[in-house]
Amino acid sequence: LGHRLFDAFALALGLPEGYFKPMVTCPPAKLRLIHYPFDASVEDVPGIGAHTDYECFTLLLADQPGLEVLNEESVWIDAPPVKNAAGEEAFVINIGDMLE
């Protein structure tokens, strides 16, 4: 999946497919899975604090509200869960520090 995403990023940037392949032949980690369960009984409790993702990219499947992003004006805004064309939960891909 990671290699396919790198190919898609390369094409989106106007680079040849496979451009990133020599740079990601031996990554330090293949996949790290983290689950932050939603607790409807808790209101307005901060989860993980403000941070950037250090990896190349992060795949998010957010099915509950709570995710926020810092916009260009340095204001935190909601990033509500998204759905695909079929109305199903969709993945969001955040660009991390290493790819930025």
Where are the regions a protein language model picked out?
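Peripheral, non-catalytic segments flanking oxidoreductase cores
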Residues: 1-100
